[in-house]
């Protein structure tokens, strides 16, 4: 039985990763340099209505709220920021996992899942941050691409 559960989880992960690639938002003048995608690994479908906050580290080494949103029916958030505002720096994406699971009647272990990353240090890039959630674990991955790809 454990083998079947593990197999289903792996298949859900493959589906998630295959659909987590960058989405075209108008070609070279794309206004979507940061996109978030969230999958509910327990139910095997997009995680809808997950609150997400993006913070940027300041010169004073504190985190300042940079952007926020809520995942749509596809488990995605587009247009969190624009190319002009998304400069080089250290960013943190915070997924509010406790609110998501409690709304489904589940008591989770984690309150938040955070992804901290350096953006645009090697030139301007577009980022897709993907998270796969379950009540007691989470995994993340990122797809980094040139805006013209």
Swiss-Prot record:
PTM per Swiss-Prot/TrEMBL: Sulfonation of the reactive cysteine Cys-32 enhances the stability of the native conformation of TTR, avoiding misassembly of the protein leading to amyloid formation.
Modified residues (4-carboxyglutamate): 64
Pfam families, per the entry: Transthyretin
Principal cellular location given in the protein's record: secreted
Entry comment describing in which tissues the protein is expressed: Detected in plasma (at protein level). Detected in liver.
UniProt-listed PROSITE patterns: TRANSTHYRETIN_1, TRANSTHYRETIN_2
Keyword Transport recorded: yes
Highest taxon of source: Eukaryota
A GO term from the CC aspect: extracellular space
Subcellular location: Secreted
Positions bound to L-thyroxine: 37, 76, 139
Signal peptide as annotated in the record: 1-20
Keywords associated with the record: Gamma-carboxyglutamic acid, Hormone, Secreted, Signal, Sulfation, Thyroid hormone, Transport
Subunit structure and binding partners: Homotetramer. Dimer of dimers. In the homotetramer, subunits assemble around a central channel that can accommodate two ligand molecules. Interacts with RBP4.
Function: Thyroid hormone-binding protein. Probably transports thyroxine from the bloodstream to the brain.
Protein name per the record: Transthyretin
Lineage summary: Eukaryota, Metazoa, Chordata, Craniata, Vertebrata
């Amino acid at each position: 039985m454990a083998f079947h559960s593990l197999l289903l989880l792996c298949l859900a992960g493959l589906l998630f990763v295959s659909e987590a690639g960058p989405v075209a938002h108008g070609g070279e003048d794309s206004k979507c340099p940061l996109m978030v995608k969230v999958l509910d690994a327990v139910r095997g479908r997009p995680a809808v209505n997950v609150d997400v906050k993006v913070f940027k580290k300041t010169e004073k080494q504190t985190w300042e709220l940079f952007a926020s949103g809520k995942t749509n029916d596809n488990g995605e958030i587009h247009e969190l920021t624009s190319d002009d505002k998304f400069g080089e720096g250290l960013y943190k994406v915070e997924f509010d996992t406790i609110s998501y699971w409690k709304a489904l009647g589940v008591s989770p272990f984690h309150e938040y899942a955070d992804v901290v990353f350096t953006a645009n240090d090697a030139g301007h890039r577009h980022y897709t941050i993907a998270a796969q959630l379950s009540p007691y674990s989470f995994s993340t991955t990122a797809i980094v691409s040139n805006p013209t790809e």
